[in-house]
């Protein structure tokens, strides 16, 4: 197909989203540096982008989770129970690492507004009480008010109920999920313009301090991911196979992680992972199920992103967090991460759910999401590399452990 009369459209469709975001980020910095008055005016573009994210996020969570549970095949978990356990342990461990790192190296963000009417929770009891009330919220009201905890509860409940529905109904839910995901992708395609407006207005108002905040946040995020990849995951694998895990870890990072870093899609990396599993000589009936499932629920990188950005908002707003609440955040971040698969910007769009634990309003939470898009050039690539390479790593660890048991018997 050629575009002789539309060279700009041809350029946009052929250029990667990452490249376009980089251009938007640089353009925003240049505009803020040389024309600060104009930079403040284009901030409206960023506001439109954030509003679009706010509009699509509740529907996305509701439809995606409901369709995913409704279309889950019966008996799938019985074949991969050890791998499923590794996925869950790995994701929760990543969230715990992110909590510890966020307290050790707290990040502060430059937000447009700090609402004075906020009422942060007083402790774990108040958080749990608020959580229960959010769970039993009216589903329509939950969607309208962006009550993500209520949305998640209703999506899980309806998903379980629809598992017993006809194939036609479940196919309809799957098509609905695909339709919503397509709308999300369209919104994400406007990320370069949104980032341009956000960066320009932010730096025109706050100057280099905002850049320092983003740099610190990015270092914490990438540091957590590297720590999980080279310390936590090898420790989990060692406990499973009882031998040096690093040859396997490095193989997975090299063969799977590098590809995922550039594709920025766990789903797109599934064929690469399946081929790697075949080369490693793993059991086909196992990895043919565990790899696609891992691309759905094994989201250590997403758990890190959700936790670090949520606690960055908490620190910025001066909200005190006790240990039980931090543990609850780790659990919530892990659950959120499992629902972030296959969606452009999925982990970022689930940040408001985690923020709601601390009474942070949706307006502020979506500003944090926008910050996430600014640093997503590296964050999303590193997150996908960690997620996808861990799919193969834990699958291989479980298979090797089963072989060790069989040989010892």
Curated annotation (Swiss-Prot):
GO cellular component: plasma membrane
Membrane-crossing residue ranges in chain numbering: 17-37, 49-69, 83-103, 142-162, 180-200, 218-238, 301-321, 331-351, 357-377
Subcellular location: Cell inner membrane
InterPro entries xrefs: Na-dicarboxylate_symporter, Na:dicarbo_symporter_sf, Ser_Thr_transp_SstT
A matching Pfam family: SDF
Assigned keywords, A-Z: Amino-acid transport, Cell inner membrane, Cell membrane, Membrane, Symport, Transmembrane, Transmembrane helix, Transport
Superkingdom as given in the UniProt entry: Bacteria
Biological process, per Gene Ontology: serine transport; threonine transport
Catalytic activity: L-serine(in) + Na(+)(in) = L-serine(out) + Na(+)(out); L-threonine(in) + Na(+)(in) = L-threonine(out) + Na(+)(out)
Membrane topology classification: Multi-pass membrane protein
GO function terms (MF aspect): neutral L-amino acid:sodium symporter activity
Main location: membrane
Role played: Involved in the import of serine and threonine into the cell, with the concomitant import of sodium (symport system).
Family per similarity comment: Belongs to the dicarboxylate/amino acid:cation symporter (DAACS) (TC 2.A.23) family.
The protein's name in its UniProt record: Serine/threonine transporter SstT
Species the sequence originates in: Pseudomonas aeruginosa (strain UCBPP-PA14)
Lineage, top ranks: Bacteria, Pseudomonadati, Pseudomonadota, Gammaproteobacteria, Pseudomonadales
